[in-house]
Amino acid sequence: MLRKGDRKMKQLKVAMLGYGIAGRAFAEILDQTHAEIMKTRGVDVRVVAITTGSRGSLYCMDSLNLTEATRQMTESGKFDKSSPTFSSMSSMDVVKTVDYDVVLELTPLNIFTGLPATDHIREALKRGKHVVSANKGPLAWHYKELRDLAKANNACFFFETTVMAGTPVFNMADNCLQFCKIDKIEGILNATTNYILKEMSKDISLEDIMRAGREGGFMEADASMDTEGWDAAAKLTVLMNAIMDADITPDLIDRTGINGITTDDINDAKARGNVIKLMCRGERHADGTVTGKVAPEEVPESDVFADERLVAVVSLYTDLMGKLTMMQYGLETTQTGYGVFIDTIRVIDTIIRD
């Protein structure tokens, strides 16, 4: 086990809750970089548990073979019950009983409550375990509680992947903007609606775009969380809570989705030299109150937010560094996995430094 202040070769045991796209991408990156981590950090990172909701779990107190885990999941969509490392443990069983140092919260999102992922994180932090979350739900609904619990138990709590995959928004705010005051955030945070609005500019109806997206496998069967603005509202909430210390929840965001947008609206905006984007805006006002809004807006074609190549973009308004903008031009599974991976490295670096 790696403990704070240790600089000798040690093990960092990782428990993974969920093994979907982000989990498998993390596993691949970890396999590729394992030797380099040992060389540069003196730490042997070992995954000892992987859980899923209905596809079985794996556990080995020494270390799991991640290549084999991915093979099983890719070939059959579940873990092999005949495997010596197969387990019936649930995510909460692992969180409460297994010997690990870091838990990766990668379970499916519940955008309306943040559960059960919040319970997983809460129990891990109570045990003094470090947490890396790719799940935005707990941060959107219970950020302050979990942040304070992490501090009380001297545990790391990182969540880079929750908003813009591996794009280092929180890392920049935490480490590169120290002593800066951030009172305003704006951006485009939902890739699905960004894609839909771009396709509608080609005179394709929303219904046809959704149908093609579902048939192509790159859009959820139920994309209402995207089109109604819930996903964007949750991401804006996470940004405002973590960067602006806002202490709000998604239901407090003034939210309007894109379901009411028509191709006529798109064309009318174009005639005015504008494009329509689902914009996210969060602000702290002079009286200390905070407000957040998600809604379709007309954006000038010359604006950075109008760039059709963008998947997502966020601007932070600071008192000392002015306006800083981070742009994401592609959305690959590697980026999502990298966000989880680099948060795990941050855990190691924090422990070694302290």
What kind of region is each of these model predictions?
Residues K4-K126:
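N-terminal glycine-/serine-/threonine-rich beta1-alpha1-beta2 phosphate-ribose binding loop
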Residues I21, A25, V45, L64, ...:
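Conserved active-site and cofactor/substrate-binding residues in soluble primary-metabolism enzymes
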Residues R55, K136-G137, T162-M164, Y329:
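Short, ordered loop/turn segments at secondary-structure junctions
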Residues V131-V132:
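A short hydrophobic/small-residue beta-strand
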Residues E199, M210-F305, V313:
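Substrate-binding/catalytic subdomain of NAD(P)-dependent oxidoreductase enzymes
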Residues D303-D354:
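ATP-dependent carboxylate/acyl-activation modules
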